[in-house]
Amino acid sequence: IYESEEWKLKRFDAFCIESAVTEPCLSRDLVKEWGTLRDGEALATCSSRTSVLRQFALFLTSLGMEAYIPSNFYKAEKNVVHILSEAEIKAFFEAVDDCVPAIKATGFHRLVTEYKVIFRLIYCCGLRISEARKLYWKDVDLQYGTIHIYQSKGHKDRLIYMATDLTELLQAYAKVLRDKYHCLSDWVFPARETDKCLSVGTIDKKFRDFWALTPFAESCDKAPTVHCLRHAFVVKRMNLWMEEGVPLKEMLPFLSRYLGHQS
């Protein structure tokens, strides 16, 4: 769960050294000191640090070790989600498609090709960023246009059906990876080191870079994130149902399961 946040535990380890902790015990005072809001720190950041330590405390207690388990986190104010308009989405993908890597190395050209596909996959299927980047080819059926998502948020599995044009895009993409870039990675979206998948940080940064190239970037009060593509998928689907006269109340349970929600 915390593979992308290993550094937080490393920071806690350094914090313990700085605090001259000598007893093998996760004490209440130590946890409280670690969980104190720091100058200039966002509530969400502090809460995230404490949440990771809570999981560590639960792990220690499962081994029979003494550990204080934090429960009261700082609650960050909920951000207003930026719902991407059709024009913004069109401009974003135009920026993605116009991208030409500054470095001529084959690996960079391959990554640009990956960005063009992964952002479309997230938008067209409403995937979470982790679900898209951690896809294996063995979980994608290019013949029938399906994707198996395993052990996603809430440890839930589900089957995703792709539209025909998206399936064809994935088929062409697989051929390009194999024939043009000679990339035989098990990952659908391999990183520069092909035994690894694209990182969250890389995908987030590229999204921001492409968004900055759109004509909407300067006038946007709240810059969108990759997750906004998932929200845009939901809004578009619901709008289509309303235009077609399909009762939302009847369809929302199906949409919820498609998205991998618990309820």
Model features per residue range: what roles?
Residues 1-263:
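Conserved catalytic core of the tyrosine transesterase superfamily
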